[in-house]
């Protein structure tokens, strides 16, 4: 069994920069993890559900880390996120900016968040650098009574990630934000480790430090 699994869902393929980051992790972390690529489906909700269901049903590792195809990170970033999971944070991620560097890709509970290197509870966490364990998935299935869809087909999955909307806030919720909603419904909190600040490749590479130290929620 490996310590954790890295999963990349990328219909357009993985950037060379992200591939280089993964190779560096292989060199420094050796055989502590496996990488799984899901690249032949443009329906991001479905592919994330398939990948997460595969992880839940497998025995190759206790923790899973989603990384987007255009995120830049170090072995230290991966190791810190893995340690957070080992320390009992069932759903936690690192910080990264949106592609234009305008703000950090998460939504806070308070109006502002200080990027001070501590772990903080947030409302919504994006999947670009997100980790979780099998317990939270099992509890989602049991407590939310999630059905197994497309059983025994190539796309068999539980609907952990679904694009929907919030009636109370009157906003659209992306599949990763809905995952956070489901986690809270199952009795869990959502966290971000502000000591983990990874890059996001757009027209240039942006890091959270390129955004304001304090920023308004989007």
Where are these regions (language model features)?
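Short beta-strand-to-loop acidic/aromatic patch adjacent to the donor-nucleotide binding site
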Residues: 60-72
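Short, Asp-centered acidic motifs that coordinate Mg2+ and/or phosphate
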Residues: 63, 89-91, 190
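Conserved catalytic core of nucleotide-sugar-dependent glycosyltransferases
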Residues: 52, 74-164
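C-terminal catalytic/acceptor-binding lobe
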Residues: 144-218
């Amino acid at each position: 069994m490996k310590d954790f699994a890295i999963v990349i869902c990328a219909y357009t393929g993985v950037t060379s920069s992200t591939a280089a980051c993964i190779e560096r992790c292989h060199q420094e972390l050796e055989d502590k993890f496996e990488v799984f690529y899901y690249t032949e489906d443009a329906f991001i909700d479905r592919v994330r559900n398939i990948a997460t269901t595969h992880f839940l049903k497998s025995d190759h590792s206790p923790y899973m880390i989603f990384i987007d195809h255009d995120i830049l990170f170090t072995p230290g970033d991966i190791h810190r996120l893995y340690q957070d999971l080992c320390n009992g944070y069932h759903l936690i991620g690192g910080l990264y900016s949106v592609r234009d560097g305008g703000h950090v890709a998460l939504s806070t509970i308070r109006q502002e968040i200080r990027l001070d290197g501590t772990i903080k509870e947030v409302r919504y966490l994006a999947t670009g650098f997100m980790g979780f364990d099998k317990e939270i998935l099992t509890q989602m299935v049991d407590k939310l009574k999630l059905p197994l869809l497309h059983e025994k087909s190539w796309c068999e999955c539980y609907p952990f990630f679904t694009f929907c909307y919030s009636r109370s806030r009157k906003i659209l919720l992306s599949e990763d934000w809905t995952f956070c909603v489901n986690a809270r419904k199952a009795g869990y909190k959502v966290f971000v480790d502000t000591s983990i600040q990874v890059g996001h490749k757009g027209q240039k590479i942006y890091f959270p430090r390129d955004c304001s130290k304090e920023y308004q929620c989007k």
